[in-house]
Amino acid sequence: MTEWIKVCEENSLKDGDLLDFDYKDKKILVARAGDEVFATDRICTHAYADLSTGFMNTDEKTVTCPLHMSIFKLEDGVPQNLPAEQPLNTYPVKIEQSWIYIFIE
């Protein structure tokens, strides 16, 4: 089933915030960089590390895995360095009536 899932109020996610969000069997990272909000898989593709405990670079729009320091672009999930080689899944995001939604298939 594909649907838009309500995550949180827009004003509760500040610039640089990394939010962990679970929906059914998916572990999702919701991140804010300036006026943009991104949603990706929350678990590093190299090792089972939770990216919501990682480090965000708002200028580069990236998140760094806290375990082995792989960097992922939030826009498309592509890893920028080793050891990660596989991209994160990304999810469409919309803001409607001050709420952040992500689209999950």
Which role fits each region the language model picked out?
Residues 1-2, 105:
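Absolute protein N-terminus
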Residues 2, 16-19:
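Intrinsic disorder/low-complexity signal
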Residues 18-104:
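Rieske [2Fe-2S] iron-sulfur-binding domain
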Residues 3-10:
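Short amphipathic
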